[in-house]
Regions:
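Extracytoplasmic/periplasmic proteins that interact with beta-lactams or build/remodel peptidoglycan
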Residues: 1-138, 153-185, 189, 419, ...
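Solvent-exposed, polar/charged alpha-helical surfaces in well-ordered, non-transmembrane soluble domains
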Residues: 2, 6, 14-18, 39, ...
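Conserved NTP-handling cores and scaffolds of large molecular machines
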Residues: 20, 49-52, 207, 339, ...
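Alpha-helix boundary/capping residues
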Residues: 20-23, 83, 87, 131-135, ...
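Beta-lactam-recognizing serine transpeptidase/beta-lactamase-like catalytic domain environment
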Residues: 95-105, 145-194, 199-432, 436, ...
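Short hydrophobic alpha-helical segments used for membrane anchoring or interfacial signaling
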Residues: 139-144
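Conserved strand-to-helix beginnings and helix N-cap segments that scaffold or border functional pockets
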Residues: 437-441
Length: 463
């Protein structure tokens, strides 16, 4: 059978029913449609459904799909399509010349698809979307102990209910607008800015060239050849160790580190943290792998070799380095987990992901410096707005990414409680024009307040 029209009005259905006996082979069928009761809440995670395209039908015909079938097109709807989709049933019938059924010759019952339960906490998702507001950007919250994605907000967004009926061409064109509402910005790649100093710190100490008690001078700029690589405050901060450099996000400290350890060492640690490849989340077709540049990539794409300035830029998460908010959240989870990496995932009760951890084999000295440095960001550095008495002990890091010719991006990531971390939150504001500590940190604070407010309330009401 071929679907001629879908989603017709009750009036159209009534009118058509009066003439079915004059239209041999044409019949009306009631069809179940998706209803998303929360509208655009978590739209990029849930996704939407739509009729099979010709290309999709060719690829799936041998799996029992047929023309006119509705399938998941984005998000969890697409990722878990094989689980959610049932199997067609059918009847072989004998009919008279008016199309009326005389007898049933054979009957094959349809089978329903299975339910899928996600790791998303709806209350935390609401808090994340409220914190993001109408800023282009993303907020991700994950459980660092197992990789469960608790919230994944992205704006601009859309209402998946609009796809339950045939969408108009005008609305489709609106959804293709310059602000790209279909894009899940949690899974798109941007320069990670100074959040990346977590990786640079780990690379420096693990290289053996910098002991944990290293103290370096900082400057208004570091000059290499004829190029000046400036400090963000244009003055320097005086002598700093790793924890102080992390707290104040001292660029010139990390420039010096990168110059000494070299690009290959920094690049190797970057890849150990999982950058440059997809995280493993189920939204495979929508996730960017980001970019970890190296000499080979630069020669192939820009026809020039890797130079020391590339290492300097990469040390502060700039240059060609690209990472998604989810990858950055995973980096914070590694710090929270004392050097163990987990797989971000959306499917609840997934034993494969829940029990899997990979050690980066970082030394105790490196882990200690990361914890103390990220804590000092909160107590006396660029993240002091999160140093509040009503929350558990936090650790975090800000980032402000240059993005010419547009305004800068703002980042902030944090985990808590520091003693036994159970949540990581990363906020990213695209082209916000403000620093991570000013723009993104308040968003992280708002989500953490929602998380710990809920857990404290649940603890208080537990029997």
């Amino acid at each position: 059978s071929i679907t001629i029209a879908r989603g017709i009005s009750p009036a159209q259905a009534t009118a058509l029913a009066e003439y079915t006996n004059q239209l041999p082979g044409v019949r009306l069928e009631a069809e179940a449609v998706r209803n998303y009761p929360n509208g655009d809440l978590a739209a990029h995670v849930i996704g939407y459904t739509g009729e099979l395209t010709d290309e999709q039908l060719k690829a799936r015909r041998d799996k029992g799909y047929r023309l006119g079938d509705v399938v998941g097109q984005m998000g969890a709807e697409a990722a878990f399509e094989s689980t959610l989709h049932g199997a067609w049933g059918g009847q072989q019938v004998e009919v008279d010349n008016a199309g009326r059924i005389i007898s049933i010759l054979g009957d094959k019952p349809a089978t329903a698809g299975q339910d899928v339960q996600l790791t998303i906490d709806l209350d935390l998702q609401r808090a994340a979307e409220a914190a993001l507001g109408t800023r282009e950007g993303a907020i991700v919250a994950i459980d660092p102990r197992n990789g469960a994605v608790l919230a994944m907000a992205s704006w601009p967004t859309y209402d998946p209910n609009i796809f339950t009926t045939r969408i108009t061409e005008a609305l489709w064109q609106q959804l293709q607008g310059a602000d790209h509402p279909f894009l899940n910005r949690s899974l798109q790649a941007f320069p990670p800015a100074s959040t990346f100093k977590i990786v640079t710190t780990a690379a420096a100490i693990e290289s053996g060239k910098y002991p944990p008690n290293t103290v370096l001078p900082t400057y208004p700029y570091v000059q290499v050849g004829g190029i000046q690589f400036g400090e963000w405050n244009r003055a320097g901060f005086g002598p700093l160790g790793f924890t102080g450099a992390m707290a104040w996000s001292a660029d010139t400290f990390f420039y010096q580190v990168a110059m000494r350890i070299g690009g290959p060492t920094l690049i190797e640690m970057t890849r150990r943290f999982g950058f440059g490849r997809k995280t493993g989340i189920e939204l495979k077709s929508e996730e960017s792998a980001g970019l970890v540049p190296d000499d080979t990539w630069k020669r192939e794409n820009l026809d020039t070799p890797w130079v020391i300035g590339d290492s300097i830029n990469m040390s502060i998460g700039q240059g060609f380095m690209q990472a998604t908010p989810l990858q950055v959240a995973n980096m914070f989870a590694i710090a929270a987990n004392d050097g163990y990496k987990v797989t971000p995932h959306l499917l609840k009760d997934n034993e494969e992901h829940r029990n899997w951890k990979e050690s980066l084999e970082l030394s105790d000295a490196t882990i200690d410096i990361l914890h103390r440095g990220l804590r000092q960001v909160i107590t006396g550095g660029t993240g002091q707005s999160l140093n509040v008495p009503h929350l558990p002990t936090l650790a975090g890091k800000s980032g402000t990414a240059e993005a010419p010719p547009g305004l800068s991006h703002a980042w902030f990531g944090a985990y808590a409680p520091m003693e036994n971390p159970e949540v990581v939150v990363v906020a990213f504001a695209e082209h916000s024009g403000g620093g991570g500590g000013k723009v993104a940190a308040p968003m992280v604070l708002q989500v953490l307040e929602a998380y710990f407010g809920k857990t404290q309330a649940e603890t208080a009401t537990a029997p």
